[in-house]
């Protein structure tokens, strides 16, 4: 058959609340994992299975090796266009999308809140329908995740979450690719999150267990992750046999961890809370004292931009810090997402160990 019936059923199930039929069917040769993502949205990693996450990372690794290391030209996006709607400022998400899409032969159009006001000058419904008629995919960075949900119901093309108040899936795919490259695999690693219970953490929580990673989370009281997401994470931990710890003690979270992760304490839109947040997060800076509690092979990740109060220079610029490899991998993982959602591409290189 031209496509896997199981995948067709799953795609139909995911879109059953939409008036639209499944957008595409995979017509290419089956890949080693028998995964088809063409036509899917990417709003949260919660909607992706373990095999689907591994497939995205495999495609990212494949594209990186073929294009960067071997110098191949792969015009997989030739004739395709990407609409980029950004309500918030961005460096890495915008650059990785624009340069990655161009590297694959496609064209991107960048629209800021000065160009388009979601739900203000024009309804989300109308915006999604217009963009669907002119482009092949939408990458949106928004304040409210609900806007993405509505957009996916009205769009007939894939919608990709470039960051919302709830999730940042593209960042976490880059983190996982970076860790896979460094450690040679992900299964069995312990991630320690020390900081705010924010969108980046939520994306880790909804995916780490699927890849066999344990999670230790330290947040100040009042800054815990969303309770709904915590419940899902607890369920995943039981289902996949991983360990989960939630605490207010940074050193307890760091104990035995392979990967130490933090992020900004003051996200975009929270500037008025700066004084209160800086006070609440005292003692949460990652320092060499923190890493003494970690595993001997510890590494450090930060999605950037970084402030010194979040992590000191000694850790941030140490050989154990993978932040700049992590930043580069934003490009390869977003390219993998676009290729997977828009084409029938099958990786040519051997699947990495996960």
Curated annotation (Swiss-Prot):
Its biological purpose: Catalyzes the second step of the urea cycle, the condensation of carbamoyl phosphate with L-ornithine to form L-citrulline. The urea cycle ensures the detoxification of ammonia by converting it to urea for excretion.
Binding locations of L-ornithine: 141, 199, 263-267, 302-305, 330
Family per record: Belongs to the aspartate/ornithine carbamoyltransferase superfamily. OTCase family.
Record comment: activity regulation: Inhibition by ornithine increases at higher pH.
Positions annotated as active site in the UniProt record: 303
Binding partners and assembly: Homotrimer.
Organelle targeting peptide span: 1-32
Binding residues annotated for carbamoyl phosphate, in chain numbering: 90-94, 141, 168, 330
Maturation and modification: Cleavage of the precursor form to the active form occurs only in the kidney.
Note: Ornithine transcarbamylase activity varies within and between different breeds of chicken.
GO biological process, one term: urea cycle
Induction: By diet of egg yolk in animals which have a high level of OTC activity due to presence of OCB gene.
Organism field: Gallus gallus
UniProt xrefs under Pfam families: OTCace (PF00185), OTCace_N (PF02729)
pH dependence statement: Optimum pH is 7.5 in the presence of 5 mM ornithine. The curve shifts toward a more alkaline region with a decrease in ornithine concentration.
Name of the protein in its database record: Ornithine transcarbamylase, mitochondrial
EC id: 2.1.3.3
Source organism, top-level taxon: Eukaryota
Tissue: Expressed in kidney, brain, heart, liver, pancreas, gizzard, small intestine and breast muscle. More abundant in mitochondrion-rich organs (heart, liver and brain) than in other organs. Activity is only detected in the kidney.
Gene this chain is encoded by: OTC
Localization per Swiss-Prot or TrEMBL: Mitochondrion matrix
């Amino acid at each position: 058959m031209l496509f896997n019936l199981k995948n067709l059923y799953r795609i139909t199930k995911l879109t059953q609340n939409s008036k639209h039929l499944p957008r595409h069917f995979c017509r290419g040769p089956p890949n080693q994992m028998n995964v088809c993502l063409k036509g899917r949205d990417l709003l949260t990693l919660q909607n992706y299975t373990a095999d689907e996450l591994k497939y995205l990372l495999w495609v990212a690794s494949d594209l990186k090796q073929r294009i960067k290391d071997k110098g191949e030209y792969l015009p997989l996006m030739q004739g395709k266009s990407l609409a980029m709607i950004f309500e918030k400022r961005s460096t890495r998400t915008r650059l990785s999308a624009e340069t990655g899409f161009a590297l694959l032969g496609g064209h991107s159009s960048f629209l800021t809140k000065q160009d388009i006001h979601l739900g203000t000058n024009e309804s989300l419904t109308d915006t999604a329908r217009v963009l669907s008629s002119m482009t092949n995919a939408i990458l949106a960075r928004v304040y409210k995740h609900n806007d993405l949900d509505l957009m996916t119901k009205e769009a007939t093309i894939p919608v990709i979450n470039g960051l919302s108040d709830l999730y940042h899936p593209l960042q976490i795919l880059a983190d996982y690719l970076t860790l896979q490259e460094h450690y040679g695999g992900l299964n069995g690693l312990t991630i320690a999150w020390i900081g705010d219970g924010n969108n980046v953490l939520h994306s880790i929580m909804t995916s780490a267990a699927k890849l066999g990673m344990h999670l230790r989370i330290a947040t100040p009281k009042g800054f815990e992750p969303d309770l709904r997401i915590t419940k899902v994470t607890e369920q995943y931990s039981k289902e996949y046999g991983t360990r989960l710890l939630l605490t207010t003690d940074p050193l307890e979270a760091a104990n035995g961890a392979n990967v130490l992760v933090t992020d900004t304490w003051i996200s975009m839109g929270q500037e008025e809370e700066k004084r209160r947040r800086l006070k609440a997060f005292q003692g949460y800076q990652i320092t060499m004292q923190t890493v003494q509690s970690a595993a001997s092979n510890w590494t450090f990740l930060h999605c950037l931009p970084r402030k010194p109060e979040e992590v000191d220079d000694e850790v941030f610029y140490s050989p154990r810090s993978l932040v700049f490899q992590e930043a580069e991998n934003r490009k390869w993982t977003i390219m993998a997402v676009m290729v997977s959602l828009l084409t029938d591409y099958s990786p040519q290189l051997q699947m990495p160990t996960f």
